[in-house]
């Protein structure tokens, strides 16, 4: 069966994302991988657009804020989760204030990751459905004129 959801993983450090990759491989999710903000931008400008972006806080050509800006311009609604190597309260607050769906550190548990992913994917799907409903043409009835 074709996966219902897709995730874009944006990182350049394979050593840090090994466990997350293993978790994603066990779920019915299509996973794409890019190594930079520029590559993420190209992927978010095409259809079908991923439902969720999991991005490293630091990238070779930018950071999480660049990915959030790119995601805001994506062709479809997409959520972003920022992943940091350390628990940093200031970074967490900045990430959430700038509109990310969530923030995770490398020290996550499998149940926590699965729960966060499910919430983020469901939220993106609801936003896409609402957007599609708002874009649907409203049928116009012909006026009945009595002569």
Could you describe each region identified by the protein language model?
Residues 65-77:
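Short amphipathic alpha-helix used as the core "switch/output" element in two-component signaling
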């Amino acid at each position: 069966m074709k996966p219902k959801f897709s995730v874009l993983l944006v990182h350049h450090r394979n050593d840090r994302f090994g466990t997350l990759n293993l978790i994603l491989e066990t779920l019915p999710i299509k996973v794409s991988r890019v190594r930079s903000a520029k590559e993420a931008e190209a992927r978010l400008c095409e259809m079908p657009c991923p439902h969720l972006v999991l991005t490293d806080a630091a990238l070779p050509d930018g950071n999480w804020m660049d990915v959030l800006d790119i995601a805001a311009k994506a062709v479809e609604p997409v959520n972003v989760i920022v992943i940091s190597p350390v628990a940093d309260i200031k970074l967490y607050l900045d990430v959430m204030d700038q509109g990310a769906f969530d923030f995770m550190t490398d020290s996550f548990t499998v149940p926590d990751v699965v729960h966060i992913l499910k919430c983020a994917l469901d939220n993106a799907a609801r936003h896409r459905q609402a957007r599609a409903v708002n874009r649907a043409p409203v049928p116009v009835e012909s006026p009945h004129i009595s002569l």
